[in-house]
Each structure stands twice: as structure tokens, then as C-alpha cells.
Amino acid sequence: MVSRLEHPAGGYKKVFESCEELAEPIPAHVSGKIPAWLSGSLLRMGPGLFEIGDEPFNHLFDGQALIHKFDLKDGRVTYHRKFIRTDAYVRAMTEKRVVITELGTAAYPDPCKNIFSRFFTYFQGTEVTDNCSVNIYPIGEDFYACTETNFITKVNPDTLETIKKVDLCNYLSVNGLTAHPHIEADGTVYNIGNCFGKNMSLAYNIVKIPPLQEEKSDPLAMSKVLVQFPSSERFKPSYVHSFGMTENHFVFVETPVKINLLKFLTSWSIRGSNYMDCFESNDRMGTWFHLAAKNPGKYIDHKFRTSAFNIFHHINCFEDQGFIVVDLCTWKGHEFVYNYLYLANLRQNWEEVKKAALRAPQPEVRRYVLPLDIHREEQGKNLVSLPYTTATAVMCSDGTVWLEPEVLFSGPRQAFEFPQINYSKFNGKDYTFAYGLGLNHFVPDRICKLNVKSKETWIWQEPDAYPSEPLFVQSPDAEDEDDGVLLSIVVKPGVSQRPAFLLILKATDLTEIARAEVDVLIPLTLHGIYKP
């Protein structure tokens, strides 16, 4: 799965350029044959505006939210995109400056206000961004674009129009939710976010949003906290980007990347800082795994520990013979990977990009195994008895269980990230195949497939082509797990008059089925969904 290419021409810089929205959908030029059954919409979220006037955004996740849609019907394809009318976007465009602080970019006071107005504004507290550039998912019959704060934005998936901003704090006891919910076949949504728990200590709540009911009432109004995980540090919650779910359990990985709550509450009013200034790493903590029963929701007080790593994306988790198998995309060590995702770093020339990646945490796909039946008298013993894995779990004298992983893939500065599976059939179940975006020194330059049982790999790659997260769509008459297609938006700037396309690959071997080229450049997209 290691990249075969170098990128001295720097074409990857094009995915970090601002674009304009489209007034209406544009036709795509199709080559190859799109399967007749593939009829629906690929909806993607990402940053589309990287500066406001003369003020640049600093971090990859600061760019203003742009929703993309490829419509597929009867072998024809159209492409459309619009900026989400968030408060962050509308006010920035109106005032022609950054108005709301983003992850790595601070908003500064309006120079037209006098000193007393600015002083009053500071001590009112900073506005939390609603820049929903990370993902989109359904709640009931509605679709919401999201980031990781308490705000989500309802959008029309057909017209891409913005409908309304929703504050999750009006429904749930959370400070925000991740952009990676788990969604069951009936439409039930599960997610995780930090909150204030007992004795004003920080904690993490798993929340449940029910499916749409017959009376068509708002599912958010019936949402509830299902179970709570304690925090390892009272006032420093870990950064949480995703979580795991099996048929009967939730898996939460607590990493040493922390949010310093005191800095978070005071930094803007005192120093005009941004969110990134509030992160710090606990180099003594390592990484903790937490488990909870799903129904009824109950915390399981087993103390699983392992060496330090960053985790953004879970691949899958499943139960087998009294064990929970957890497959993750990890980054070794306690340093925060987001420190390397500033736009100034990502836009550097190829040799400089490679040098920066040498200093960054190194990626690795890992499998951990957590035993459910634990006895203190088994000290020093490996509790894992599954025959197909080398992962271990050893009982220690202090009652903790030390985990060592099985490495499923490792390549120097070669990441398997933005993982996807046949979610509708195999999420939370024993599975074989994972699909992902290959990062070459942080540059996305290939699509990958991994057999998690045999470790066999496949890749799709072209020179000067920069794909996005591949989404799996199952064939309607599928019998095998990987019977379907992968959809990915690819940017290929080069000399072509059509610098971007929707790529359709056969999921079994990553051979190309078709592509739908458009005559506009498409900036980086992060996550999305396929809507039949």
C-alpha cells in the first residue's frame, strides 16, 4: 500500500485553493460505463474558502464549509456545490474579515469599534464556530452538515440550500459532538461528546438520537444520554474525533492529546488565541481504552492501557468469543498530528513536505483486542485466546490490562486513513475488507484496500492525481462483502481542461469502471455520504 510516486511538481497544492460556488449543476463528461443500478447522490463536505479578503485562514480545518454533490442517474452525472450559509461564513463575507475564531485562526476585533466596545466583547466570551466543513449525516428525514462543536446545520440535500442552524446544547448535555456518528439500519444515531460530569469533572457522554417516529416529531427532541465515560483528567478532556460500536458495546479510546479547559475558557479574552492554542499533550499518560454496554447503557470498569498514540478514525470493532476486536488508524506518540496540518506546511514544495513528515507522528493500522472476562489472579498472563491475531492483553499487578497491538499495515510516512467499510452490512461485525485514502507524507495520492485478515493490499494511483476518502456502495444483488463500487472525488490539475472527476472503482480489485470529469477545480473534501 506504499505510494509508488513522488510529487515534485506540487500539484497537490491545488486542493488547498479557494473556489467559487456554482449557480446550478454542471454536466460531467463520462468515460467508461456507470453501473445501471448506481443512481443517487454523492454528498461531500470540505473547506472551500481559505481566505477572507486579505486575511488567510491558517489551518486545514479553518476553511469555510462547502457542500458538494455528484448526482448519478441513467449513466449521466452532474456536479453542484454551494457554501453553507453558516454564521461564520455570512458574517465573514459581510464584514470582509474573519469574524469567528476557527481551529487555527483567531478572529480579531472590528477595527471600527472603539476600545470600550472591544473590551465588552472580549468579556462576553468568544463565539463558538458553526463552520460545518467536516461531514454530513441524516437525522430522521433531515440532513445535517457538521463540525465538532455544539452547532450542526440543516441542509437540503437536493438543492444544497442552507435551512437552519441547530444548537445541540438545547437537546443534550454535551459541549459538542463528533462528526463521526454511528447510524443503525433503523436510523438510530449514536455519537459521543465531552460534558461536565460528577463534581464538575469532565466526562464523555454517549448520546442516542432515535429514528423518525410515525408522528413525524423531531428526533432531536427525543435524544438522550445513554452512558457516560469518566475522564482521566478532571479539567483536561481528551480530543475525540470518533468512537467504536459493536452490536452490544461502545468503545472509547482516550488519548494523551488534551484540551486545557482553563486555556479554552480564557485564551481569547486574554490573548486573542485560537483553538489550537488550547491543545496540549500529556507525555506520561499513554492511551486508555474504555468500554460500555450498549443496552442498557452501563460503563464497564476495566482499566485497559497501552502506549501513547493519536487516533482520529476507527475502522471497525466487533465481538468474538468474549473479546472485542478494535481496528484503528493510529499515529504513534503523544504529539498532536494537527500540529502538522497548517496550510503553510501543506502548501510547501515537495521536499519540504517530506521533511515535515519526518518529524511528525508516524501512522500505523493496528488491531487491539480487549477481553471482557477479566480476573485479577491472572497476573502476567496474556488473556487473548483468539487464534487469528497476535494482539495481546496482559493483566498487571495494579489491576490494569496492558494491550499490545497486531500491526495490520505500517509504512514509513505512508498512512492508511479516512477508512471505510461495507458499513450497512458489517459495521460492528466480523469483517474482512477496509478501504482508505493513502497519504504520502500527508499528501493524498492513492486509494487503498486492505484485507484485515490476510493483510493483502490493493491500490489505485495515477501521476499527479489526488483522491479523497473512498465511499463504498454495495451492489443491490451482492453476495460477497466487497461486491460493490468505491466513489472518490479526484483532483488532477496537470494540463487537462477537466481538472477534477468522480472516480468509480470496482471494490473487489480497485480497477476503474468509469470517471465523470468536470471543467472546474474541486478543493479538498473530508467526509461524506452516498444518498440513494
Swiss-Prot record:
Record's keyword annotation contains Hydrolase: yes
Cofactor annotation: Fe(2+)
Membrane topology: Lipid-anchor
GO molecular function term, any single one: retinol isomerase activity
Modification after translation: Palmitoylated.
Catalytic activity as recorded in UniProt: an all-trans-retinyl ester + H2O = 13-cis-retinol + a fatty acid + H(+); lutein = (3R,3'S)-zeaxanthin
Primary location: cytoplasm
Tissue: Predominantly expressed in brain. Expressed at a low level in the eye.
Disulfide bond positions: none
GO cellular component, one term: plasma membrane
Keyword tRNA-binding: no
UniProtKB keywords: Cell membrane, Cytoplasm, Hydrolase, Iron, Isomerase, Lipoprotein, Membrane, Metal-binding, Palmitate
Chain positions recorded as Fe cation binding sites: H180, H241, H313, H527
Note on how the cofactor is bound: Binds 1 Fe(2+) ion per subunit.
Annotated compartments: Cytoplasm; Cell membrane
Lipidation (S-palmitoyl cysteine): C112, C329
One GO-annotated biological process of the protein: retinoid metabolic process
Pfam families: RPE65
Residue stretches in coiled coil: none
EC number assigned by the record: 3.1.1.90, 5.3.3.22
Family recorded in the similarity comment: Belongs to the carotenoid oxygenase family.
Function text: Specifically generates 13-cis retinol, a stereoisomeric form of retinoic acid. Capable of catalyzing the isomerization of lutein to meso-zeaxanthin an eye-specific carotenoid.
Cross-referenced PANTHER family: ALL-TRANS-RETINYL ESTER 13-CIS ISOMEROHYDROLASE-RELATED, BETA-CAROTENE DIOXYGENASE
Protein name: All-trans-retinyl ester 13-cis isomerohydrolase
Classification lineage: Eukaryota, Metazoa, Chordata, Craniata, Vertebrata
